[in-house]
Amino acid sequence: MSDHNVNSTFRKTLVELCETATWITSQVYAAKNLEKNDLITVDNKISALYPIAEKYDRSFRTTTVILDEELILKLENAASSLWNSLTIAMKAEKASDKYFNEVFCKCKIFATKLLSIHEALFRTNTNLLRNFKCYISSFKSASEYRFDDLITNTQQHSEKYLQIINENVESFSNEEKTEFKKLTFEFYLVNFQLYLSENDLDTANIYTAKVNITDNSKYMDADLLIELCRMIYNSTVMLKEINNPETQLVDVNIISFLKDVEKYLELPVENLKSHTDYSNLKYSVLIFMANCLVEGHPQASELEQCDHYLSLLQNEYPNKVDPFILAINLTKRRNIVNPAETIEEILMRMIMSVDVISNFQAVIASINDLSKMNTKFSIVCLDYLLINKLNSKNDSKFLGKAICSRFLITTQSKTMNDSEIAESLENFSTQMERIVSEPLTKHAISCIITLLWNTGKKLEKMEKYVVSIRFYKLALKDIISQNYSDRGKIQRALQVVYNKIEDYSNTVRVYQDMDEVDRQSPLCQLLMLQSFLADDKTEEALTCLQKIKSSEDEKSTDALILAVAECKRKTDLSVQGLLMIFDKLQSKSNSQTISSTSSSQTLSILRYTLQMIVKVSEEEPLETFINYLPTVQKLLQKAVEFLKTVKLLNQLPPDVEKEAIYQQSVAVNEIEWFASFSYNVAVKCLVDQSCESISEFPQYCIQFIDLIPVQDFTFPKMYHFTYWRFKATILQLIIAKEKAKQDQHQKDWDIYEKSEELVNSINVMKKSSEFKDGSSLEDRNTLHECFLEALTIHLESALMMPDQTRILDILKKTELYQDSRVDALLIDISSNMEDLPKGVLIEILETVLKRNMGPEVKERELCSWLRILLENAINLNHEVELRILDRVLKILNINQSSLQDTDGVLQTELETIATYCWNIGVNYIIKDNKSNGIVWCKHSMGFANMVNEGLQEQLYSLWESLASSANIDINSIAK
């Protein structure tokens, strides 16, 4: 290819580079409106052309190319324009978008490369220095934004230019040499900053030596030096953040760099100390260095440095609070005997030096911190601040906060005893009257009173009543609570303590100091009632009860109940008070009034009232209890209705409007209490036979239990409630039996049906897998006892009805249970019923005795059943099946060796059975039924043989006579 063609190609490419630079310049001037797609286009163009520009730069340095001056000038102008536009745009925009900054950095490097091509075509020292300067600037931008690839590129090119210039520096003029030194200095500075930010301290120190700022300060003006110091400071801050913030050692590298900055700030640079940023930067450097030293657990050698810098800071910057705080922290880290005293001294210097208002939070925090070590020292500092540093009118906001802090650190003190705390605050409250000229804010008053209230309550709970009184009295001082809306609450608390120490005269004195509204408070009247009762002033106490009853306060009902409870030792007063409770409750008995009662009080009123009735009734004759029963019934009915309403409304969607009283969750134990109370009242009524409406109470118990979501509980809790529902139903049936006097048949029939339903329900529970898996032995026993109780009622009701079919049904059902206890129950009930037809009794006995009886049936019980059967069979001339006798005799023979009869009952039973069998046998023989007669007589001797050989001998003797007279073979019964 000819030189002409080569030059033509170069020319075309350079023209394209110039046009691209010009186009990019236009984009840069529109930087505010650039979208990401625009940036991508710019980025793509640079990525495509930069390698070509790089190639041309190298070629032009090794190959001579002849180009017209106009093109070379155009290249310079395009590159310079692009560079200048970028410089302006990057200063103006300061974009936070990373890609924006990256593209603009690439643009700077592209512009620098074009200037480098120009320098290769038109070589001068000025162009060489300009390119070096541009590469340093690009290197600085890439370092600032942390674009690693661009950092490497610009750093390498800067190094290359540094080498080129060093090779040609002899030909430079003095001005050019000076410029080169400045640029070299700046290049080393950028490297220093880069390696320092990367925590490459060794390389950073190398560049520190190369920079040699102290000797080269003549090349620096105040702005550059301030910027340099700020850069090093910022780098050390970053380095501190990168390192473990909880390190236990002083970072010597950070301290070294900060000391360098301190030294640089003292260099003889013109206008340095008058620079607007000088003072703040120096303070930042010194305070950061002091902070690093103090926080790094300084050793003995470093403590002197800490003292030096803290002293320097406090002297040069007396209005700054941080040096004093650091001095306090350093004191804590030192192993000294009494650090609190030293800290107090530092705090006092701080308060006297700094602007307290602008540093209020820091000063108060330091005082609060000292209070944990020694509250008395902190109080000295805070009182000085309050008296000397705050103006009541101008600084009222801060004055209120400081006063609150005074009460806070004193009441929370761990280094003062209760009496010292009270005395300190009493003295301070006197000082407050001189300090405060304007009323304290509501917030400040509330804060102070809360602290005094809580302290008084804490001491009251600890039974330190005398000291607690001092805190309540402090809260009642006019300077503190004159405008407090709930002053009466504090006065009542004071009355409570006076009552506890039986200082009733002061209780009355506090009452006299109250506002009229607070005097009429139900709680205040309750406290006054206590004092009157203690002084045996019954009339005054009655007046208190009447005032509480008349009060419309939402707490008046509770207060009245508590007041009546206080009267328990005054029977007449107690009865009058109880009547007041009923009167007050009666006024709230209709639904409208009850619905307006506060939701938290509804059930408690009912519960407390019921408890009061029981309590009073226990100490009075039964008649009193009977008189109150209609009221009890009414209250329980109200409780049921209320809880049913709550349950129903809680099942509705949340957006359905409901009365406030029903928008509450009721605890299960609350419902259980009402169920238990209803049950116990029913039992008492049953025992005392004291109420016509007794059947309502077990029904209430059942209704309460039905309101409990037993399905939501685990088995033990579910069984507990189910069991008590069974018990309540049994109690209801027992009461129904007692009342069954008129319309006997109909009532027996109702009892029969209900008891049958109950027996079936219990059986279902017993057979359920849930019960079998989850029940304990005790659960199984208690449920079976419950089953037997229900079955007893069921059997009795069946036997009371003349319907033979029912009795047969009962016999069939009991056989299915296969339980000897059920059989025993069946016989016991039927045998003890005087009105039961004997034929029915015989049928029951025969049915039970025919069953396959297991070992659970005791021999005595078995003989008793047989004896009753034989006795009734003889009276009714009923033929008893012989297999019954065979079965009983067989069981007795099997168990003969283990028979126990310490009281002789079994012997009597067997002797009676033997006698009955003998008589039946004789009757058969008389009727010429000799075969049956022989069998019965033989069984008679068998039973006699079990317990009484004498009886057997006697019977056999009779048999010989009987057999002889009846022509029966005597040997048909073996002796």
Curated annotation (Swiss-Prot):
One of its GO terms (biological process) is protein sumoylation. Keywords: Meiosis, Sporulation. The keyword Transport does not apply. GO terms for cellular component: condensed nuclear chromosome; nucleus; synapsis initiation complex. The keyword Manganese does not apply. It holds the Pfam family SPO22. InterPro entries: Spo22/ZIP4, Spo22/ZIP4/TEX11. Coiled coil: none annotated. Involved in chromosome segregation during sporulation. Belongs to the SPO22 family. This is Sporulation-specific protein 22. It comes from Saccharomyces cerevisiae (strain ATCC 204508 / S288c).
